[in-house]
Design a protein with these regions (language model features):
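General small-molecule cofactor/ligand-binding pocket signal
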Residues: 4, 117-119, 178-182
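N-terminal Rossmann-like or analogous alpha/beta NTP/dinucleotide-binding catalytic cores
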Residues: 88-175
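Glycine-rich, Lys/Arg-enriched anion-binding loops that position phosphate/diphosphate groups
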Residues: 170-271
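N-terminal catalytic cores of NTP/NDP-binding nucleotidyl/phosphoryl-transfer enzymes
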Residues: 38-101
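Residue-level signal for inorganic ion chemistry
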Residues: 56, 109, 148, 208, ...
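Phosphate/ribose-recognition catalytic cores of enzymes acting on nucleotide-derived substrates
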Residues: 3-4, 225-339
């Protein structure tokens, strides 16, 4: 995909990077300073703003509604988002673990028929903009917004007492931006990224998957471990993942494992190796059923389908081996139902 920087005379650094997913939608777009990757002008777009962590069913509803509204108006679609959680800058608190990496988020937004994603360079200066200033400087002047679709519970800009949707409509009228409110079709499901994080932190991947509208995924690179699984006849791929990515609660899970365009059944353990390593190190390791190849250095994606059991301590290796055989049988059964 093409990536361009968006400049603004109001800031000393580009206000955003735009990831163009559908180049045909921006035939009239202009790129300045050829070769520098900066000064890209989109033209007129329909946009929506949000962090979109997880791109769950509520987000999908907003994005698909934006697609419909944009086509009715003959506009390209743009999702405006952030690389880091705004809370970490605005409130100076630690950001929650992410349901999606930035790359995953961009790809999932693209699956909702969005033409481009603008990732804001959310500086302290940008955080001080009021909603009206944000709409003018970032959305209208910077990104060319002509239509803005707002989620039913979304707000942006430096908080202002009693500011509401009617104010956004008024600001938009002054700036030449049509502002609309997305309907509440998904609201009754009480969808939120926070509720999905909580479910995953409890190990309830099945319920989390329902709210996501797909299976939760974690990707990483296979690194060398202690090879204890190999000694038991269950060799595992130990994954090193993005440290900001949320990992489900400790325990064992039935997973699909994606590797080089292929999919394999797998049983994944997230734990502290209580039996073999005295609980000193958290690990994420997967045994691929009916698979023999060496995966060191390879990239894998785990698709979490269901929880097998809690983390537990075993009296010895034979007890652990018996449990792993039971886990494998249960994994096959669980995945067969998920086909």
């Amino acid at each position: 995909m093409d990536v361009y920087a968006i400049d603004s005379p109001h800031f000393s650094v580009p206000i955003a990077e735009v990831f163009v997913l559908n180049r045909a939608a921006f035939q009239s777009a202009t790129k300045h300073n050829e070769g520098s990757g900066s000064g890209f002008t989109l033209g007129e777009v329909a946009c929506t703003v949000g962090f979109f962590d997880g791109v769950h069913r509520g987000h999908q509803h907003v994005l698909q509604s934006l697609h419909t509204a944009a086509r009715e108006r003959g506009l390209s679609t743009l999702a405006v988002t952030f690389a880091q959680h705004p809370r970490s800058l605005v409130r100076n608190v630690a950001a929650p673990p992410s349901l999606t990496t930035l790359q995953e988020k961009i790809e999932l937004i693209g699956d909702c028929h969005i033409d481009a994603v603008a990732v804001l360079n959310f500086t302290p200066e940008m955080a001080q903009l009021t909603a009206q200033e944000f709409m003018q400087i970032v959305l209208r002047e910077g990104l060319g917004a002509e239509f803005l679709l707002m989620g039913y519970d979304h707000r942006f800009g430096r908080p202002k007492a009693d500011e509401g949707f009617a104010d956004y409509v008024r600001y938009g009228a002054d700036l030449g931006i049509e502002v609309a409110l997305c309907d509440k079709e998904e609201a009754e499901l009480q969808l939120s990224s926070s509720s999905i994080r909580l479910l995953l932190e409890q190990g309830n991947v099945a319920e989390a998957n329902l709210l996501l509208g797909r299976s939760y995924k974690v990707s990483g690179t296979v690194v060398h471990g202690f090879q204890n699984g190999r000694k038991l006849g269950y060799p595992t791929a130990n994954l090193e993942i993005d440290t900001a990515k949320l990992v489900p609660h400790l325990g064992s899970y039935a997973t699909w494992v994606e590797w080089r365009g292929q999919r394999f059944a797998g049983m994944t353990n997230i734990g502290r190796r209580p039996t073999l390593n005295n609980g000193t190190q958290i690990s994420l390791e997967t045994h691929l059923l009916d698979f023999k190849d060496d995966l060191y250095g390879e990239s894998l994606t785990l698709e979490f389908i269901g929880r097998l059991r809690d983390e537990k301590r075993f009296e010895g290796l034979e007890h652990l081996k018996t449990q792993l055989a039971q886990d494998a049988e249960k994994t096959r059964e669980m995945l067969s139902k998920a086909l």
